[in-house]
């Protein structure tokens, strides 16, 4: 009798093994269409990846904390414990990375005619860690994260986070570069005078000016729509002034202030 294993036919569901064989395909992990945050072999240029999939990093840059020969490190600061109103900016770094995936495939940036990623070695450094259950130590943790990156002579691009994170970042930058010129886009001045140094997203630029981290005479605050009796020496372009000025004229004035 014929053994069951030797039968072929529509009723048995058995098909010759040769018909089941799928040709093997070699996939080079460095040219795979996804997860360039982990697999890209160059710090320069772009490599198209589906905007809807793959591991997210800023502009699909490589995830790494190795900063040798790196021009720019992008670091997230998921902190919003200083806000006095609606929280949620702790999700900012993740959201910016997700949005950046929609721009990471363009060979040339509209209006520029070139792509800065062709000339700059940019990496995603990941997020600065701090214990959310110990908020008093968060400013020091943010400062140390920034300090360690700057110590390698790498430029730091930070993703917040509420406004307060600017203060420990300014501390780290001023320690390395000296007094800074600040260009600040906001609806509020964040220079409310308060002598105690509590964690607050409305006082950090007051403290930065008082401590010599920034030079108000070489700093501009742009788009303010709330009143503050004291400007503390900052150059202010309020919202009506910004609406009246052409963007190129505003940029020229800010450049002159910064020097």
PLM regions: where:
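Extreme N-terminal basic, low-complexity initiation segments
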Residues: 2-12
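N-terminal acidic, proline/glycine-rich, low-complexity intrinsically disordered segments
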Residues: 1-2, 30
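Conserved alpha-helical scaffold segments that buttress catalytic/binding sites
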Residues: 31-259
């Amino acid at each position: 009798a014929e053994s069951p294993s030797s039968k072929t036919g529509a009723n048995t569901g058995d098909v010759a093994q040769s018909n089941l064989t799928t040709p093997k395909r070699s996939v080079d992990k460095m040219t795979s269409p996804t997860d360039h945050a982990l697999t890209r072999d160059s710090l320069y240029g772009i490599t198209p990846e589906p905007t809807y999939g793959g591991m997210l990093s800023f502009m699909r840059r490589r995830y790494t904390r190795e900063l040798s020969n790196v021009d720019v490190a992008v670091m997230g600061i998921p902190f919003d414990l200083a806000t006095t109103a609606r929280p949620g900016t702790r999700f900012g770094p993740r959201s910016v990375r997700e949005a950046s995936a929609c721009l990471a495939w363009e060979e040339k940036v509209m209006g520029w005619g070139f792509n800065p990623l062709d000339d700059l070695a940019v990496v995603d450094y990941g997020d600065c860690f701090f214990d959310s259950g110990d908020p008093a130590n968060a400013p020091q943790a943010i400062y140390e994260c920034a300090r360690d990156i700057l110590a390698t002579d790498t430029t730091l691009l930070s993703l917040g986070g509420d406004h307060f994170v600017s203060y420990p970042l300014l501390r780290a930058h001023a320690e390395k570069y000296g007094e800074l010129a600040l260009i600040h886009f906001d609806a509020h001045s964040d220079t409310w005078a308060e002598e105690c140094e509590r964690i607050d997203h409305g006082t950090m630029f007051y403290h930065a000016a008082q401590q010599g981290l920034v030079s108000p005479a070489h700093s501009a605050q742009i788009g303010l729509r709330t009143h503050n009796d004291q400007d503390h020496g900052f150059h202010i372009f309020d919202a009506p002034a910004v609406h009246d000025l052409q963007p190129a004229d505003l940029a020229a004035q800010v450049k002159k202030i910064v020097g």
